[in-house]
Structures are given as structure tokens and as C-alpha cells.
């Protein structure tokens, strides 16, 4: 059964930096990672998308929380159109953050699975680069080598995040 997180009392996440990348992966490798109730969005037959996204949330960007960084690993999936048409829908299989309170909130409210608290999230705005690490060292370094970086601030976007918890599939409406 699919549980829906209520859309009343929506929380709007306000970020000031984001970077995302997509990797093409054979659907046969993706399917075992997904609950049977959802399916990956294929860009061509047999090819799905793995997504890595990093955010910087300034102090107050999510309620009373301090400035923190977030790192998400997800698979792009078919959306639930009965809830609206999102920019995209994702099945989140790992969430990392530099703020434990954010991880706790995300697990409780959105049912998102957390990796663990990250030791650091370094944002280099001048070079459009990020680096994240945990107690074992660096886990991700990413930079945008493009010269035309779009304006993502000041535009509210709707996303759907699917998560599996205790055998139940949850859908969270996210507004960024």
C-alpha cells in the first residue's frame, strides 16, 4: 500500500546553492533497488537515471535549523500524477546531511532513509564545486564545468520523493 504524506502545512525548503547530476544506468541494474509499486523513468528503453543532488540551506532555510548541506542519492521514477505534475519524481535511497536535526526531521516527516551525519559539506560558489565527507574521508567531489549556469533561486519547484520504510511506500510532496 502507498501512504501519502499530507499536503497540509507544507514546508517550503529555501536553498541558496544546488548542484545535480544524472547518470545513465541500465534499467536491469536499477529495478532491484526499487519497491515493486514504482518503476524507473526510462530516457530510452532499458536506460534509467541515477541522480546525485547537493544543496546548501542557509540558516532559516528550513525552519529554525542552522546553515547545513544535504546530499541525496535517488533514482528518477514515474510520478504519481494524481498529486500534481512534478518537475520530477525520485525514489530516495540515501540522504546525507551535515545537520543531525535535519536528518531526524527528514526521517520522521518525509520517511527518507538517512546515510548518516556527514562531517562536512564544502560549497565553492566561485568554481561551482562541492565536496562532501564523512568520518572515513571524502565521499564525493563534484564540479560543474559548464559556463551557463541557470538561475534556480526565486522559483518554487514541486518534486515528489518516494521512500520505503518498514515495507510501506511513502510519497512526500517537496517544494523547493
Predicted features by range, described:
Residues 1-59:
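Hydrophobic, proline/glycine-rich low-complexity stretches
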Residues 1-2, 103-176:
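Interaction-surface and assembly-scaffold signal
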Residues 8-10, 62-63, 146-148, 162:
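Intrinsically disordered, low-complexity segments enriched in polar/charged residues with Gly/Pro
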Residues 11-12, 30, 38, 43, ...:
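Weak global preference for isoleucine
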Residues 15-17, 22, 55-57, 68, ...:
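Phenylalanine-focused residue identity feature
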Residues 20-23, 75, 143-144:
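Short beta-strand element of the conserved SAM-dependent methyltransferase core
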Residues 57-139:
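Aromatic- and glycine-enriched beta-alpha-beta binding-site module
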Amino acid at each position: 500500500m502507498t501512504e501519502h504524506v499530507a499536503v497540509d502545512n507544507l514546508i517550503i525548503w529555501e536553498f541558496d546553492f544546488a548542484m545535480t547530476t544524472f547518470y545513465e544506468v541500465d534499467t536491469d541494474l536499477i529495478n532491484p533497488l526499487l519497491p515493486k509499486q514504482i518503476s524507473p523513468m526510462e530516457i530510452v528503453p532499458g536506460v534509467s537515471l541515477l541522480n546525485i543532488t547537493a544543496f546548501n540551506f542557509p540558516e532559516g532555510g528550513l525552519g529554525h535549523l542552522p546553515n547545513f548541506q544535504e546530499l541525496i542519492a535517488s533514482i528518477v521514477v514515474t510520478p504519481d500524477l494524481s498529486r500534481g505534475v512534478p518537475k520530477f519524481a525520485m525514489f530516495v535511497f540515501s540522504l546525507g546531511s551535515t545537520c543531525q536535526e535535519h536528518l531526524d526531521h527528514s526521517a520522521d516527516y518525509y520517511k527518507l532513509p538517512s546515510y548518516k551525519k556527514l562531517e562536512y559539506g564544502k560549497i565553492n560558489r566561485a568554481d561551482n564545486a562541492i565536496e562532501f565527507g564523512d568520518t572515513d574521508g571524502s565521499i564525493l567531489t563534484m564540479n560543474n564545468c559548464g559556463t551557463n549556469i541557470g538561475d534556480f533561486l526565486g522559483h518554487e519547484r514541486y518534486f515528489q520523493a518516494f521512500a520505503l520504510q518498514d515495507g510501506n511506500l511513502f510519497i512526500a510532496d517537496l517544494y523547493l
